[in-house]
A protein has these predicted regions:
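Intrinsically disordered, low-complexity segments enriched in small/polar residues
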Residues: 14, 22, 53, 113, ...
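Short beta-strand-centered interaction patches in the first periplasmic/extracellular domains
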Residues: 57, 64-83, 118-184
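Hydrophobic, Leu/Ile/Phe/Ala-enriched alpha-helical segments that form helix-helix packing faces
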Residues: 1, 102-110, 138-145, 149
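Surface-exposed charge patches in extracellular/virion surface proteins
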Residues: 8, 36-40, 48, 113, ...
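Short amphipathic beta-strand and strand-loop transition segments with alternating hydrophobic
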Residues: 9-22, 62-67, 151-155
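Juxtamembrane "anchor/assembly" segments of surface/extracellular structural proteins
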Residues: 1-44, 77-83
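Surface-exposed cap/loop segments at beta↔alpha junctions
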Residues: 37-121, 127
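Short, solvent-exposed secondary-structure boundary motifs
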Residues: 5-12, 49-57, 137-143
């Protein structure tokens, strides 16, 4: 199903709002469609919404839907929020490890691929006690490495998900721009 306000027969949307959060560049997207359109049946929790906006790819999971006889309003979260669905346990490194080695330990399914890695020269020993979500642990690893992370969605030409890239930047300081700098 395609949402396209310029195409007469496509399902049109309105009241759409995209929020971008600095930490990890997570996103939420809310939009409304007509419940009378035949494709409105696909606006359900668990389905995906993919689009390109200002040259950036977005791939979001619909997590909440409100329906009445006239409209369907959906809220979708970016896939970085998907990393909150899996937990990891306590972990202690046996020796100093690179950022990438920690990511492999905490994301063995390779949900994300590391792109830019400005801390690739560092090796650190650390211990985590207790359980945490994969997303929380990745932010914790970034903190240990004095780094900031962002997640970048990459779509195929048909708008299916190609991959999620995690870029790692040195933490913002007088000498480093961190995530906040546009890196087009």
């Amino acid at each position: 199903t395609f949402l396209d306000n310029t195409h007469r027969n496509s399902m049109h949307y309105w009241n759409d709002e995209l929020h971008e959060y600095l930490q990890g560049t997570a996103n939420t997207y809310t939009f409304t469609v007509s419940s009378k359109h035949e494709d409105a049946v696909y606006t359900v929790e668990g389905n995906k919404v993919a689009f390109v906006y200002n040259g950036k790819d977005y791939y979001l999971n619909i997590v909440h839907v409100e329906k009445d006889e006239f409209t369907v309003t959906a809220t979708a979260w970016s896939l970085s929020f998907e990393l909150i669905n899996e937990n990891v346990g306590a972990y202690k490194s046996e020796s100093a490890m690179s950022f990438e080695e920690y990511v492999t330990a905490f994301d063995p399914e390779r949900t994300v691929r590391i792109g830019i890695n400005e801390v690739s020269d560092k090796r650190i020993s650390n211990e985590w006690t207790g359980e945490a979500t994969v997303l929380s642990r990745l932010f914790s690893v970034a903190n240990v490495f004095d780094a900031e992370i962002e997640f970048q969605t990459v779509l195929n030409d048909d708008y299916s998900l190609k991959e999620i890239v995690m870029n790692v930047y040195r933490e913002h300081s007088d000498n480093n721009t961190g995530v906040g700098e546009f890196r087009g």
